[in-house]
Curated annotation (Swiss-Prot):
A zinc finger (unnamed) spans 3-34. Pfam families: ATP-cone, Zn_ribbon_NrdR. NCBIfam families: transcriptional regulator NrdR. Signal peptide: none annotated. GO terms for molecular function: ATP binding; DNA binding; zinc ion binding. Residues 46-136 form the ATP-cone domain. Its cofactor is Zn(2+). Binds 1 zinc ion. This is Transcriptional repressor NrdR. Negatively regulates transcription of bacterial ribonucleotide reductase nrd genes and operons by binding to NrdR-boxes. It comes from Mycolicibacterium paratuberculosis (strain ATCC BAA-968 / K-10) (Mycobacterium paratuberculosis). The gene is nrdR. GO terms for biological process: negative regulation of DNA-templated transcription. Keywords: ATP-binding, DNA-binding, Metal-binding, Nucleotide-binding, Repressor, Transcription, Transcription regulation, Zinc, Zinc-finger. It comes from the Bacteria.
């Protein structure tokens, strides 16, 4: 790897450690030319294939910004959004494919968001599933009630 300071084409790894619950490797490097040290983080590439066919890297930030819009005005904090984004990434990575359709990312968001905030879930689902009428909302609300009944036996 090139040194970010002097652009020397080689560097030596001094230390390697797993981070992000084993999803990344943090490497401490040293440049033989200028002697400066720097850190790199390596992760397995996860790509999202959009409907248009364009491929882009998976982005937790993009998941968070989409969900944040659905949570606008709701009592959902940044920690909860970060946890949701981590859950979505874990679900998508668990599929075992280096490329995943954007549709699968949306599906991976729905479950954790439903558990986090039902109103935000309905907002997100209405856009994601292209609701066209009040009947679509009624069906989704009924499914939420059924899920709640299964989740909390009473």
């Amino acid at each position: 790897m090139h040194c970010p300071f002097c652009r020397h084409p080689d560097s030596r790894v001094i230390d390697s450690r797993e981070t992000d619950e084993g999803q990344a490797i943090r490497r401490r490097r040293s440049c033989p030319e200028c002697g400066r040290r720097f850190t790199t983080v390596e992760t397995a590439v996860l790509a999202v294939v959009k409907r248009s066919g364009v491929t882009e890297p998976f982005s937790r930030e993009k998941v968070i910004s989409g969900v944040r819009r659905a949570c606008q005005g709701r009592q959902v904090d940044d920690d909860a959004l970060n946890l949701l984004a981590q859950q979505v990434e874990d679900t998508v990575r668990a599929a075992g494919s280096p490329e995943v359709p954007s549709h699968e990312v949306g599906l991976a968001i729905l479950g954790p968001l439903r558990d986090l905030d039902e109103v935000a879930y309905l907002r997100f689902a209405s856009v994601y599933r292209s609701f066209e009428s009040a009947d679509d909302f009624e069906r989704e609300i009924q499914a939420l009630r059924e899920h709640r009944g299964v989740a909390t036996p009473g």
